[in-house]
Amino acid sequence: MVENIIELRDISKHYEELTVLDNFNLDIKKNEFLTLLGPSGCGKTTTLKIIAGFEYADDGKVLFEGKEINNLPPYERQVNTVFQKYALFPHMDVYENVAFGLKIKKTPKDVIDAKVKEVLKLVALEGFERRQVESLSGGQQQRIAIARALVNEPKVLLLDEPLGALDLKLRQEMQIELKRIQKKLGITFVFVTHDQEEALTMSDTIVVMYKGKIQQMGTPQDIYNEPKNSFVAKFIGESNIFDGIMIEDYKVNFCNRDFECVDKGFEKNENIEVVIRPEDIKMVKPEEGMLKGKVTSTVFKGVHYEIELNENGRLWILHNTKNAEVGTELGMDIYPEDIHIMRKENN
């Protein structure tokens, strides 16, 4: 059985009248890359700060390897944090920045030298010891910040939107680099972001948050392919969402016709919501489609065209490598495995 390294139990946090975390529970496993994903104000950074000890919960318990650490100050917790603002010391070179925490602990110089060299090699900056941090690129500075956190050998590394200030290409490179570092070290990473691509690319587990609550927790594949509610479906990628009725196991009705699906376990004639991803819709001739509609707009997105279709007053979004002409009629085919059923939310 996989052991949890961090457990949050019934955590609540309020700022005056605002509830940031509401009876929040989360288990974080040893050696996993877990991402807290959600829009601004959902509580993800507050969760990270409570784990780090920079904020204290109003109610609930924080457990580290089974022991409560609610009142433990940050410097006594076996975690280190990397922020979007790297907070490097501009008057120090790379070596001095990375070694800073070890010097505070009065670590012997030969041990510091060995650890700094080892961690700079890990972040692919071997030989940069005497470079001034101001001479480094944004990506290199981010690696130094990560090296400074890792040199203390924490059991958990907390990362609060650390790639937000980087340009797209560098951000994508750092996503791969962070995952490589985490796998090599085998320690727990807890990563905070509002960027869905970052979460899907790097994570073993994604925790989707909204208004201080967990909406869904699972693998990237589970979160993307089987969203539990309309918030998750809309937040993770683009989605076509329609009201429907679950006629029986493996059969659903939406858009005024019956479809085969792969879902079961619903009540007969239960009101549900249907999610279909734009890339899962097959474009066919109008007479060959399960549904058909008129093209209202197309946009070139680089790797595909985004096509908007009006089907009996309902807006559909399709992604296809082939374009379609505005005003023409298209058919749509949808395979059973591409129809995802969600229970209707109680509003």
From Swiss-Prot:
Q: Where in the cell is it found?
A: Cell membrane
Q: How does it sit in the membrane?
A: Peripheral membrane protein
Q: Name one GO molecular function term.
A: ABC-type putrescine transporter activity
Boundaries of each ABC transporter domain copy?
A: 6-236
Q: What are the binding positions for ATP in this chain?
A: G38, P39, S40, G41, C42, G43, K44, T45
Cellular component terms (Gene Ontology): ATP-binding cassette (ABC) transporter complex
Keywords annotated in UniProt: ATP-binding, Cell membrane, Membrane, Nucleotide-binding, Translocase, Transport
Q: Which InterPro entries match?
A: AAA+_ATPase (IPR003593), ABC_SmlMolc_Importer (IPR050093), ABC_transporter-like_ATP-bd (IPR003439), ABC_transporter-like_CS (IPR017871), Mo/tungstate-bd_C_term_dom (IPR008995), P-loop_NTPase (IPR027417), PotA-like (IPR005893), PotA_ATP-bd (IPR017879)
**What EC number(s) does its UniProt record assign?**
7.6.2.11
Keyword hit for Translocase: yes
Q: Has the keyword Manganese been applied to this entry?
A: no
Enzyme class, broadest EC rank: translocase
SUPFAM superfamilies given in the database record? MOP-like, P-loop containing nucleoside triphosphate hydrolases
Q: Which reaction does it catalyse?
A: ATP + H2O + polyamine-[polyamine-binding protein]Side 1 = ADP + phosphate + polyamineSide 2 + [polyamine-binding protein]Side 1
State the protein's purpose.
Part of the ABC transporter complex PotABCD involved in spermidine/putrescine import. Responsible for energy coupling to the transport system.
Query: What family does this belong to?
Result: Belongs to the ABC transporter superfamily. Spermidine/putrescine importer (TC 3.A.1.11.1) family.
Q: How does it assemble?
A: The complex is composed of two ATP-binding proteins (PotA), two transmembrane proteins (PotB and PotC) and a solute-binding protein (PotD).
This protein's name: Spermidine/putrescine import ATP-binding protein PotA
Instruction: State the organism named in the record.
Output: Clostridioides difficile (strain 630) (Peptoclostridium difficile)
